[in-house]
Amino acid sequence: VVVYDHHADSAERFCGWLEGKCTSAQRAVDLEQACRDADLVVFATTAATPYVHDASVFAQAPTVLHLSLRDLAPEVIASVQNITDDVEHSMKANTSLHLAEQQLGSRAFVAGTFADLASGTLQPDFSRPRVFSPFGLGVLDLAVASLVLDAATKAGTAMEIPGFHIPNLSWSS
């Protein structure tokens, strides 16, 4: 795992937290170094406005999970394959996709949705970066819920509600 943060001390603390949780964690000195050889790039920031204006940081055509939704400038969004969970919902609140729509005057830069990808009606374009912006999916909500459930189960305080959870599905079966 390669970690970059505008605040070096935050990156160092996160690398320390990752120690023992993954094979290795190192701090990058800049965003370009962090992205250079990555197959997967995850943006999880508190950025209120885009700060990534140069798409060349994704020259190796990675998959980009854009959780924080406001990191990428419209010119970057226009140059990648954009996939979102809900096109309408993602075009609000000055997200990167919303700003691109305002600048470009259309939504033609959105290739499709996660459902399109899952159903096979949309194929990933591996010749360029693929950016997934999950604005309405509630990914962080699910992660926190999973953490709480795991902790409650481990502590013996979880209450099972029969039929509430769908059993894990295997994509290989």
What are these model-predicted stretches?
Residues 1-18:
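NAD(P)-binding Rossmann-fold cofactor-contacting core
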